[in-house]
């Protein structure tokens, strides 16, 4: 039997026809857990439906999605009603959903919530343990794949913001079995390395299964115990992992992580200029204060210096000498006036002046002045003082 050769389109169209004509596959209900959920701008919803062993892609078009009365999320256990078919453009098998009903929470989601609650109660998410991101990081350690878009985005943002910042990559698997162990090794490597300011742990978006390594408890504990601040940049803005909660800062995307970690060079230059102006002002102010204190101390020193004290003492002595001379002069003048007054008094009462007027002073032999005749009641020797001399004689009473 000759084997027929088919084109790819022939093959996919044939499989699609077989599936579309299958009674069971044309109208079925499938139970599973939602993962890798995406809401397209067109209004269509894309996700995967999985269980422990298998996964199938699903799509719900806008016309059906607008009728949904539940909010879909990753990890949700649902019952999907619709049909199976082939998307011929890619040859992929998928379910076309007409209805989606919530059944419960998926196994991974339950596991995620349990670990989240456990770590939260243990204080792993507390703000008081969050380390500050340095304002002016010089060297940033990156733990991510060496070939993904994450490292390219971080490098591009870093070059744009500040080309002086160094990026050091620790290449690690970010998806697959035990990938979290390589991420742990990267964090521990940078904690031992000198001069690293920040660590960024990142990868692109994905389903809950693809991001599950970032939900491992062992990784969460290593992030918590890191001496260096860690920025978590896992998935897209709508994706959250345990690593996001325990990290010091959660960035919605790797590019945003670089924006947070890398300071703008223009901001640094502006800050340096402001600090320079402030320092110059403070230095000038300090110099002015020092000069003022120096001048004040100089004046005080002059007042209390030995030479100043000697000069002041001389000045004080001169003042005292002037006061003493003045007091002596006043005293002399007063005494002179007293002497002149006494001299005038003596002069006024000088006996010689009386004698000049023709009077005489009579004294007995004992130099007693004879004032009355009764003092001469017998013969006595007397002395008579005249203006031009003295004469002696005997007193003879008249009988």
UniProtKB/Swiss-Prot annotation:
According to its UniProt entry, the function of this protein is described as:
Bidirectionally degrades single-stranded DNA into large acid-insoluble oligonucleotides, which are then degraded further into small acid-soluble oligonucleotides.
Q: What is its EC number?
A: 3.1.11.6
The catalysed reaction is: Exonucleolytic cleavage in either 5'- to 3'- or 3'- to 5'-direction to yield nucleoside 5'-phosphates
Gene Ontology MF: a single term? nucleic acid binding
Q: By its UniProt entry, which Pfam families does this protein fall under?
A: Exonuc_VII_L (PF02601), tRNA_anti_2 (PF13742)
Q: Which organism is it from?
A: Clostridium botulinum (strain Eklund 17B / Type B)
Would you tell me the protein name for this molecule?
Answer: Exodeoxyribonuclease 7 large subunit
**How is the subunit organization of this protein annotated in UniProt?**
Heterooligomer composed of large and small subunits.
UniProt record, GO biological process: DNA catabolic process
